[in-house]
Structures are given as C-alpha cells and as structure tokens.
Amino acid sequence: MRGVAYCLLLLIVAGCGSSEFVPGDIEIPTGFETANFRLRPITVADAEKDYAAVMESIGLIHTALLGDRWPTDSFTLEQNRKDLAKKERRFEQRKSFTFTVVSLDEDRVLGCVYINKGRRGPDAAVFMWVRQSSYDDGLDPVLESAVREWVKREWPFEWVVYPGRTAPEVSAE
C-alpha cells in the first residue's frame, strides 16, 4: 500500500517535463549557512563524502523519500558519482535542485535537500534527509525549520509541499 501511495505522490509532485522549473530570469538561491551547517548545490566533487552519508543513512533516506527503495544496500560509489552528475546537470538546466548539507569545514556531508517541480497543484515539493549520526544528534528538525524559512524567503513559490513532514503544506502570503 505504501508503494502505491508513493507512486501516486510522484505523479502529483514530480516534474518530468523538459521545461525549466524556475524561469531563466529568476536568480536561483545558492544556499545558506547557519551556526551548525552549510547548504549549497551538490556537485560530483561531493561524491565520496555524500556516499558515506548515504550508506550510513539508508533507512532514514527510505523514510524521507516515502518508501522509495533508493539507495539499495548494493549502491556503489560509481553509481553515486553518476547520480550526482545527473543532479548537477538538472540544477544547471533549472529542472530540479539538489543541495548538500555539509559541516562548516566541509569535511562531512550531513544530509541532502531536494527541491522538485510540483504538478497538479503545488509549485514545488521539498524532500530532505540527514545522515543517521546527525539525526541522532537532533539535526533533522533544525534543518527542516531552516529549509522551510529559506524556501519561503528566497524561492519564487506560492505553494510548497514537504511530503512526509509533520506540516506538509506551506502557502506563501
């Protein structure tokens, strides 16, 4: 049943078309920094540190992505490099936006934030996860609060959904 719900959710929020998600005349926010972490666009150069975070956090990622089975236990570093290259291209093409959450010294990836095109209603769907050790340290609600405020303040969306989060919808006023 959860798989069916996830598929329906993807039909509603996933942008599959070739058009830009955010028009070219709008400047794309490039992230922000707090006292605890930095959020910035993910690149292929992040592959090894991102891979370590992903593999530490498979269960949390499956929950954050509403039952999606990515990544599998057999996910490889090379597959991660290819995945990040695709995410980097989609960012440049303005089709979707993936941000890495890193420690301030950039030594450790703490999580990831995905901003995807909405369909049939919401302008955007935002998914996020933090690595297991950061989750255990209480980073998840801190990240969620900071991301919600940043999206509301910096992005050109009127209706944003946060699937799987306690307050799933935010409408800008």
Spans of model-derived segments:
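GNAT-family acyltransferases
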Residues: 17-134, 145-173
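Bacterial N-terminal signal peptides
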Residues: 6-14
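A short acidic/glycine-rich loop-to-helix N-cap element
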Residues: 135-141
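Positively charged n-region of N-terminal signal peptides that target proteins for export
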Residues: 1-4
